[in-house]
Design a protein with these regions (language model features):
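Catalytic Zn2+-binding segment of zinc metalloproteases
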Residues: 109-125
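Hydrophobic helix-coil surface modules that form long, contiguous segments used
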Residues: 1-106, 131, 135
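Short, intrinsically disordered, charge-balanced linker/junction segments flanking boundaries
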Residues: 125-129, 137
Length: 137
């Protein structure tokens, strides 16, 4: 479980299955979250269709947090990320920055299935949580 308290802007859209996805950004930076939202809108229906398991919460949220030490964390329903792992300047970000954001968004959303809906039986099975790497191949 996670929650964030602060002043944020957000952008939102529904994916092809009608699931509302929100990306929270620092105030005045909504346009920097659009790329991550676009990636999430394509990734979310893929996972839902591939695993044939719907998401039991009303919506997933992604939030950019300044100086977030972990880089990113797949909390149940609230994916928290360092700003550099979620925000993209549409006019100035490099292709490498966009690729990094796309990989991190896909990775953390996959954890909503691997690690949240289905989780390991014991710590010796920690590898299971990182099965999302299959999407890279």
């Amino acid at each position: 479980m996670a929650f964030v308290v602060g002043e944020y802007d957000y952008i939102e859209a529904k994916d092809s299955n009608g699931v509302l996805i929100r990306v929270y950004t620092p105030l005045g930076q909504k346009h920097f979250g659009q790329f991550a939202l676009d990636v999430a809108l394509k990734t979310w229906p893929f996972y839902t269709g591939y695993f044939k398991i719907g998401y039991p919460l009303p919506k997933p949220d992604l939030i950019a947090i300044a100086d977030f030490a972990a880089g990113a964390m797949e909390n149940w329903g609230l994916v928290t990320k360092r700003e550099t792992a979620l925000l993209v300047d549409p006019d100035n970000s490099s292709l490498q920055s966009k690729q990094r954001v796309a990989i991190v968004v896909g990775h953390e959303l996959a954890h909503q299935w691997f690690g949240n809906i289905v989780t390991m039986e014991w710590w010796t099975h920690l590898w299971f949580v990182f099965l999302d790497k299959f999407v890279w191949f």
